[in-house]
Protein backbone atom coordinates (compact mmCIF):
# COMPACT_ATOMS: atom_id res chain seq x y z
CA UNK A 1 0.00 0.00 0.00
CA UNK A 2 1.35 3.43 -0.91
CA UNK A 3 1.48 6.78 0.80
CA UNK A 4 -1.95 7.86 -0.43
CA UNK A 5 -3.63 5.27 1.75
CA UNK A 6 -1.63 6.43 4.79
CA UNK A 7 -3.27 9.83 4.54
CA UNK A 8 -6.78 8.37 4.81
CA UNK A 9 -8.78 10.53 7.16
CA UNK A 10 -6.13 13.22 7.59
CA UNK A 11 -6.93 16.92 7.65
CA UNK A 12 -3.54 17.93 6.27
CA UNK A 13 -1.87 17.09 2.98
CA UNK A 14 1.64 16.68 4.35
CA UNK A 15 3.29 13.52 3.03
CA UNK A 16 4.46 10.90 5.47
CA UNK A 17 6.92 8.11 4.92
CA UNK A 18 5.59 4.60 5.40
CA UNK A 19 7.78 2.23 7.41
CA UNK A 20 6.96 -1.42 6.70
CA UNK A 21 10.17 -3.00 8.00
CA UNK A 22 9.91 -5.57 10.79
CA UNK A 23 11.30 -4.69 14.18
CA UNK A 24 15.06 -4.22 14.27
CA UNK A 25 15.82 -2.44 17.53
CA UNK A 26 19.11 -0.76 18.23
CA UNK A 27 20.03 1.56 21.11
CA UNK A 28 18.82 5.10 20.55
CA UNK A 29 16.66 4.19 17.59
CA UNK A 30 13.90 6.68 16.99
CA UNK A 31 11.12 7.03 14.49
CA UNK A 32 7.79 5.28 14.03
CA UNK A 33 7.10 2.22 11.95
CA UNK A 34 3.66 2.86 10.52
CA UNK A 35 1.71 -0.08 9.15
CA UNK A 36 -1.47 1.01 7.38
CA UNK A 37 -4.58 -1.09 6.99
CA UNK A 38 -7.01 -0.70 4.12
CA UNK A 39 -10.23 -0.24 6.01
CA UNK A 40 -12.63 2.37 7.20
CA UNK A 41 -13.27 6.01 6.69
CA UNK A 42 -13.74 8.79 9.04
CA UNK A 43 -17.61 11.16 13.17
CA UNK A 44 -21.36 13.00 20.57
CA UNK A 45 -20.95 12.75 24.68
CA UNK A 46 -23.29 12.30 27.43
CA UNK A 47 -21.87 12.18 30.88
CA UNK A 48 -23.99 12.27 33.99
CA UNK A 49 -22.00 13.07 37.09
CA UNK A 50 -25.02 12.66 39.37
CA UNK A 51 -25.16 9.27 41.06
CA UNK A 52 -28.68 7.87 41.20
CA UNK A 53 -28.81 4.28 42.46
CA UNK A 54 -25.20 4.01 41.24
CA UNK A 55 -26.49 4.30 37.67
CA UNK A 56 -24.60 6.45 35.17
CA UNK A 57 -25.58 7.61 31.68
CA UNK A 58 -23.89 6.10 28.65
CA UNK A 59 -21.34 8.37 27.03
CA UNK A 60 -22.37 9.01 23.41
CA UNK A 61 -19.97 11.62 22.01
CA UNK A 62 -17.92 10.17 19.15
CA UNK A 63 -14.82 11.64 17.47
CA UNK A 64 -14.31 11.77 13.72
CA UNK A 65 -10.83 10.40 14.32
CA UNK A 66 -9.07 9.18 17.43
CA UNK A 67 -5.67 7.91 18.47
CA UNK A 68 -4.83 5.28 21.07
CA UNK A 69 -1.37 5.64 22.68
CA UNK A 70 -0.06 2.75 24.77
CA UNK A 71 3.19 1.31 26.07
CA UNK A 72 3.10 -2.21 24.62
CA UNK A 73 1.49 -4.38 21.98
CA UNK A 74 -1.67 -5.83 23.61
CA UNK A 75 -2.27 -2.82 25.94
CA UNK A 76 -4.82 -1.34 23.53
CA UNK A 77 -6.71 -4.64 23.36
CA UNK A 78 -6.79 -5.16 27.11
CA UNK A 79 -7.76 -1.47 27.32
CA UNK A 80 -10.03 0.46 24.94
CA UNK A 81 -10.51 -2.07 22.11
CA UNK A 82 -14.26 -2.22 22.69
CA UNK A 83 -14.57 1.56 22.52
CA UNK A 84 -12.33 1.73 19.45
CA UNK A 85 -14.33 -0.93 17.61
CA UNK A 86 -17.63 0.72 18.59
CA UNK A 87 -16.52 4.11 17.31
CA UNK A 88 -15.04 2.64 14.14
CA UNK A 89 -18.27 0.78 13.38
CA UNK A 90 -20.10 4.10 13.73
CA UNK A 91 -17.81 5.83 11.21
CA UNK A 92 -14.75 7.04 13.14
CA UNK A 93 -11.17 6.43 12.03
CA UNK A 94 -8.66 5.24 14.62
CA UNK A 95 -4.88 5.02 14.71
CA UNK A 96 -2.88 3.02 17.26
CA UNK A 97 0.56 3.97 18.60
CA UNK A 98 2.68 1.47 20.57
CA UNK A 99 5.66 3.10 22.25
CA UNK A 100 7.55 -0.20 22.61
CA UNK A 101 7.42 -3.49 20.73
CA UNK A 102 7.22 -5.62 23.86
CA UNK A 103 10.70 -7.15 23.55
CA UNK A 104 10.90 -7.71 27.33
CA UNK A 105 7.43 -9.22 27.63
CA UNK A 106 8.35 -12.84 28.24
CA UNK A 107 9.19 -15.15 31.14
CA UNK A 108 11.77 -17.25 29.27
CA UNK A 109 15.26 -15.72 29.80
CA UNK A 110 16.55 -17.58 26.74
CA UNK A 111 13.99 -16.00 24.43
CA UNK A 112 15.50 -13.73 21.76
CA UNK A 113 14.15 -10.21 22.44
CA UNK A 114 14.24 -9.31 18.75
CA UNK A 115 12.24 -12.37 17.76
CA UNK A 116 9.76 -11.68 20.55
CA UNK A 117 9.40 -8.08 19.40
CA UNK A 118 8.78 -9.15 15.81
CA UNK A 119 6.19 -11.67 16.96
CA UNK A 120 4.42 -9.15 19.17
CA UNK A 121 4.34 -6.54 16.42
CA UNK A 122 2.70 -9.08 14.12
CA UNK A 123 0.22 -10.03 16.84
CA UNK A 124 -0.67 -6.36 17.27
CA UNK A 125 -1.12 -5.89 13.52
CA UNK A 126 -3.54 -8.81 13.47
CA UNK A 127 -5.44 -7.47 16.47
CA UNK A 128 -5.56 -3.98 14.98
CA UNK A 129 -7.09 -5.42 11.82
CA UNK A 130 -9.76 -7.12 13.94
CA UNK A 131 -10.60 -3.88 15.74
CA UNK A 132 -10.55 -1.89 12.50
CA UNK A 133 -7.81 0.70 12.99
CA UNK A 134 -6.61 2.57 9.93
CA UNK A 135 -3.08 1.67 11.02
CA UNK A 136 -0.56 1.18 13.80
CA UNK A 137 2.80 2.80 14.56
CA UNK A 138 5.60 1.20 16.58
CA UNK A 139 8.01 3.72 18.10
CA UNK A 140 10.59 1.03 19.03
CA UNK A 141 11.42 2.37 22.47
CA UNK A 142 13.00 -0.04 25.00
CA UNK A 143 10.45 -2.26 26.70
CA UNK A 144 10.62 -2.02 30.48
CA UNK A 145 12.66 1.18 30.31
CA UNK A 146 10.26 3.59 28.66
CA UNK A 147 10.94 7.19 29.68
CA UNK A 148 8.86 10.32 29.18
CA UNK A 149 11.64 12.32 27.57
CA UNK A 150 11.85 14.86 24.74
CA UNK A 151 12.58 12.28 22.00
CA UNK A 152 9.49 10.25 22.93
CA UNK A 153 7.30 13.34 23.15
CA UNK A 154 8.56 14.52 19.78
CA UNK A 155 7.61 11.17 18.23
CA UNK A 156 4.16 11.36 19.79
CA UNK A 157 3.68 14.96 18.66
CA UNK A 158 4.63 13.86 15.15
CA UNK A 159 2.02 11.09 15.32
CA UNK A 160 -0.67 13.46 16.60
CA UNK A 161 0.05 16.19 14.08
CA UNK A 162 0.08 13.66 11.26
CA UNK A 163 -3.20 11.88 12.01
CA UNK A 164 -4.81 14.93 13.68
CA UNK A 165 -7.21 13.14 16.05
CA UNK A 166 -10.11 14.77 17.83
CA UNK A 167 -9.59 12.48 20.82
CA UNK A 168 -6.65 10.61 22.34
CA UNK A 169 -7.09 7.52 24.51
CA UNK A 170 -4.24 6.67 26.87
CA UNK A 171 -3.56 5.54 30.42
CA UNK A 172 -4.31 7.70 33.44
CA UNK A 173 -0.96 9.24 34.43
CA UNK A 174 -2.13 9.65 38.03
CA UNK A 175 -2.41 5.90 38.58
CA UNK A 176 0.55 4.21 40.25
CA UNK A 177 -1.47 1.71 42.28
CA UNK A 178 -4.66 0.14 40.89
CA UNK A 179 -7.04 0.38 43.82
CA UNK A 180 -5.36 -1.80 46.42
CA UNK A 181 -4.70 -4.79 44.21
CA UNK A 182 -1.92 -4.04 41.75
CA UNK A 183 0.93 -1.79 40.61
CA UNK A 184 0.63 0.03 37.30
CA UNK A 185 3.48 -1.03 35.01
CA UNK A 186 6.21 1.60 34.74
CA UNK A 187 5.87 1.63 30.93
CA UNK A 188 2.14 2.22 31.24
CA UNK A 189 2.84 5.23 33.46
CA UNK A 190 5.54 6.60 31.16
CA UNK A 191 3.39 6.17 28.05
CA UNK A 192 0.45 7.85 29.79
CA UNK A 193 2.28 10.97 30.95
CA UNK A 194 4.17 11.23 27.65
CA UNK A 195 0.87 11.08 25.76
CA UNK A 196 -0.68 13.75 27.99
CA UNK A 197 2.38 15.99 27.63
CA UNK A 198 2.37 15.50 23.87
CA UNK A 199 -1.30 16.41 23.63
CA UNK A 200 -0.90 19.50 25.84
CA UNK A 201 0.88 21.70 25.31
CA UNK A 202 3.29 20.31 22.71
CA UNK A 203 1.06 19.17 19.83
CA UNK A 204 -0.94 22.39 19.80
CA UNK A 205 2.04 24.72 20.26
CA UNK A 206 3.79 25.62 16.97
CA UNK A 207 6.85 26.68 18.97
CA UNK A 208 7.27 23.14 20.32
CA UNK A 209 9.54 21.11 18.04
CA UNK A 210 9.39 23.93 15.44
CA UNK A 211 11.09 21.79 12.81
CA UNK A 212 7.92 19.70 12.65
CA UNK A 213 5.85 22.73 11.66
CA UNK A 214 8.47 23.72 9.11
CA UNK A 215 8.23 20.24 7.60
CA UNK A 216 4.48 20.64 7.12
CA UNK A 217 3.15 19.19 10.39
CA UNK A 218 1.12 22.12 11.69
CA UNK A 219 0.12 22.41 15.33
CA UNK A 220 -3.03 20.47 16.20
CA UNK A 221 -5.47 20.72 19.11
CA UNK A 222 -6.76 17.43 20.48
CA UNK A 223 -10.20 18.13 21.88
CA UNK A 224 -10.60 15.34 24.42
CA UNK A 225 -8.53 12.93 26.45
CA UNK A 226 -9.94 9.57 27.55
CA UNK A 227 -7.84 8.19 30.40
CA UNK A 228 -8.25 4.42 30.71
CA UNK A 229 -7.46 2.18 33.69
CA UNK A 230 -8.33 5.12 35.92
CA UNK A 231 -9.11 4.97 39.62
CA UNK A 232 -11.48 7.91 38.99
CA UNK A 233 -13.64 6.97 35.96
CA UNK A 234 -16.45 9.37 35.15
CA UNK A 235 -17.68 8.26 31.71
CA UNK A 236 -18.81 4.86 30.46
CA UNK A 237 -18.98 3.85 26.80
CA UNK A 238 -21.47 1.16 25.75
CA UNK A 239 -19.40 -1.52 23.98
CA UNK A 240 -22.02 -4.27 24.01
CA UNK A 241 -21.95 -4.72 20.25
CA UNK A 242 -18.14 -4.90 20.20
CA UNK A 243 -17.43 -7.08 23.24
CA UNK A 244 -16.88 -10.20 21.16
CA UNK A 245 -14.55 -8.29 18.86
CA UNK A 246 -12.44 -7.18 21.80
CA UNK A 247 -12.02 -10.82 22.80
CA UNK A 248 -11.20 -11.77 19.21
CA UNK A 249 -8.52 -9.07 19.12
CA UNK A 250 -7.06 -10.37 22.38
CA UNK A 251 -6.81 -13.86 20.89
CA UNK A 252 -4.16 -12.46 18.54
CA UNK A 253 -1.75 -12.01 21.48
CA UNK A 254 -0.90 -15.68 21.87
CA UNK A 255 2.62 -14.97 23.14
CA UNK A 256 1.23 -13.11 26.15
CA UNK A 257 -1.99 -14.93 27.04
CA UNK A 258 -1.27 -18.41 28.39
CA UNK A 259 -4.71 -19.06 29.91
CA UNK A 260 -6.93 -17.52 27.26
CA UNK A 261 -10.30 -18.70 28.49
CA UNK A 262 -9.54 -17.64 32.04
CA UNK A 263 -8.34 -14.22 30.87
CA UNK A 264 -11.31 -13.75 28.55
CA UNK A 265 -13.75 -14.69 31.30
CA UNK A 266 -12.24 -12.01 33.55
CA UNK A 267 -12.32 -9.43 30.73
CA UNK A 268 -15.96 -10.20 29.95
CA UNK A 269 -16.77 -9.99 33.66
CA UNK A 270 -15.14 -6.58 33.90
CA UNK A 271 -17.03 -5.27 30.86
CA UNK A 272 -20.26 -6.64 32.32
CA UNK A 273 -19.63 -4.96 35.69
CA UNK A 274 -19.01 -1.64 33.96
CA UNK A 275 -22.06 -2.16 31.78
CA UNK A 276 -24.29 -2.58 34.82
CA UNK A 277 -23.46 0.99 35.82
CA UNK A 278 -25.17 2.33 32.69
CA UNK A 279 -27.73 -0.43 32.19
CA UNK A 280 -26.12 -2.21 29.22
CA UNK A 281 -24.49 -5.58 28.65
CA UNK A 282 -20.90 -4.32 28.42
CA UNK A 283 -19.05 -1.03 28.87
CA UNK A 284 -15.58 0.48 29.21
CA UNK A 285 -14.84 3.35 31.57
CA UNK A 286 -12.62 6.42 31.36
CA UNK A 287 -11.69 9.61 33.12
CA UNK A 288 -12.62 12.32 30.62
CA UNK A 289 -10.74 15.59 30.14
CA UNK A 290 -12.39 18.11 27.80
CA UNK A 291 -9.69 20.35 26.34
CA UNK A 292 -11.63 22.22 23.66
CA UNK A 293 -15.31 22.28 22.90
CA UNK A 294 -17.51 24.15 20.45
CA UNK A 295 -20.20 26.05 22.39
CA UNK A 296 -23.05 24.50 20.39
CA UNK A 297 -21.82 21.01 21.32
CA UNK A 298 -21.74 21.58 25.06
CA UNK A 299 -24.15 19.51 27.10
CA UNK A 300 -24.96 19.63 30.79
CA UNK A 301 -22.99 16.45 31.18
CA UNK A 302 -19.92 17.79 29.41
CA UNK A 303 -20.05 20.99 31.43
CA UNK A 304 -19.16 18.94 34.49
CA UNK A 305 -15.99 17.59 32.91
CA UNK A 306 -12.66 19.27 33.73
CA UNK A 307 -11.55 21.74 31.08
CA UNK A 308 -7.84 22.41 30.63
CA UNK A 309 -6.46 25.91 30.35
CA UNK A 310 -6.38 27.06 26.73
CA UNK A 311 -3.07 27.84 25.10
Residue ranges and their predicted role:
Residues 50-67, 149-311:
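Metal-dependent de-N-acetylase/amidase catalytic core
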Residues 39, 46-164, 306:
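Active-site rim/loop-helix segments in enzyme catalytic domains that contact anionic ligands
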Residues 1-15:
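Extreme N-terminal basic, low-complexity initiation segments
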Residues 9, 28-29:
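Short linear segments in intrinsically disordered or otherwise low-structure-confidence regions
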Amino acid sequence: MGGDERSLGRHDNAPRRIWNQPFAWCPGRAGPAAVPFDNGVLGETGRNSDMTDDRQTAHTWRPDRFMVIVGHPDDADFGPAGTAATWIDAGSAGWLVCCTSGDAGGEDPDLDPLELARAREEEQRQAATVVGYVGVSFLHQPDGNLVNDLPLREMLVREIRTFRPDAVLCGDPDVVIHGNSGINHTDHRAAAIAAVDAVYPAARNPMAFPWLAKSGLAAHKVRRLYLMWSNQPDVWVDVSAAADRKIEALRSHASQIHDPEGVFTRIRGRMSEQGELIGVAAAESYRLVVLDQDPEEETTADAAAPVAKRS
